[in-house]
Regions:
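Phosphate/pyrophosphate-binding loop motifs in nucleotide- or prenyl diphosphate-using proteins
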Residues: 7-196
């Protein structure tokens, strides 16, 4: 217990310093520090994955500036925190934060929303309302983030639940884009093979 308290105080002290000081010049030679104190190249698979997750989180932040229902805003806000946790896992090899329940929650949300949507007979193009287009943009960024995390997993084992989470998240974003269009009374844009 005492060791745990000491560690927490030390962690707060380190984080306070790291968050207060914006630049350190330590990365000027192409390396950067990870959460466990180790160094890695700025173009390493781990840093590429962190960047993709951060980009996804930023896109979801942009979505939150749109006029969305309180329920969807709450879902997206929780996702932002989970993505930050996922970034923490990537930054600290061997660290696990994302849990099975986080994955199950995404699955429940997907199932709940999807049952109220009309069945798809054609592929959907990104678009409709601006908020839905942003959601589709987040979905495509999520797919890329997923690729980077799975690539990292091929070399260094990543938390199984984190892999499941990032995979389910892109599915949720697809469903949410449709839900947002429905709420805004805007039709989804359907693919037309022979359009001229």
């Amino acid at each position: 217990m005492i060791v745990s308290l000491m560690y927490n105080r030390l962690e707060r002290k380190i984080m306070g310093y790291r968050l207060s000081k914006i630049f350190t010049r330590n990365g000027d030679k192409g390396t950067t520090g990870l959460g466990d104190g180790s160094k890695t190249k700025k173009f390493s698979d781990r840093i590429v994955a962190l960047g993709a997750i951060d980009e996804l989180n930023s896109m979801i932040g942009l979505m939150l500036t749109e006029n969305l229902t309180p329920k969807i805003k709450k879902i997206l806000t929780v996702i932002q925190h989970h993505l930050f946790n996922l970034g923490g896992e990537i930054s600290m090899p061997g660290h696990k934060i994302i849990q099975k329940n986080d994955v199950l929650e995404l699955e429940e949300i997907i199932t709940s929303y999807n049952k109220d949507l009309p069945p798809l007979k054609e592929f959907i193009l990104p678009g409709g309302s601006r908020a839905a287009a942003f959601c589709h943009m987040a979905r495509t960024i999520c797919r890329r983030a997923e690729q980077t995390v799975f690539k990292l997993n091929s070399k260094d084992t990543i938390n199984t639940f984190s892999l499941q989470y990032i995979n389910r998240l892109s599915d949720l974003l697809f469903v949410l884009a449709r839900v947002i269009n429905k709420h805004k009374k805007v039709k989804d844009v359907f693919w037309k093979k022979n359009i001229r």
